[in-house]
Amino acid sequence: MAFIKKIKRKWQGREKWSVTAVTQGNPVSTKELCEYIADSTTASASDVYATLLALPKIMELNMKNGRSVKLEGIGTFRYKVSAAMVDKEAEAGESLIRDVRVQFTPERTVTAVGKRRITRRALIPDNIKWEIYDKPSKSKKTTEEG
């Protein structure tokens, strides 16, 4: 199950409540992913590990050469820049780039059901069960005397 927490925000001068997704515990490690993949394929965990370790460099090489990277069943990765603005087109160029990030877009499939079109994004199942995450309080532990 996935977790959400309640958050209070100000909107148009009034307090409103909403929720945001939160994670719990440590992220799933590369080693754990390799074991899951090896258990469900014919590849060994060490082969999967070597492949996953090579993936970022191969993706970087292709993206720095102007290509996006699409992983079937997962989605597409591409560079996204934030840049300063100038008044004249002649001044616009690489020197305006302040930050470069990787933009990820989950793969999308569209299915026609009668007259409706249903869009589904990779990595987002239809049946996520959400539970409110109650952060443990940071109060001091008390000991019982017997």
Describe each model-derived feature in a short phrase.
Residues 1-50, 57-146:
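Strongly charged
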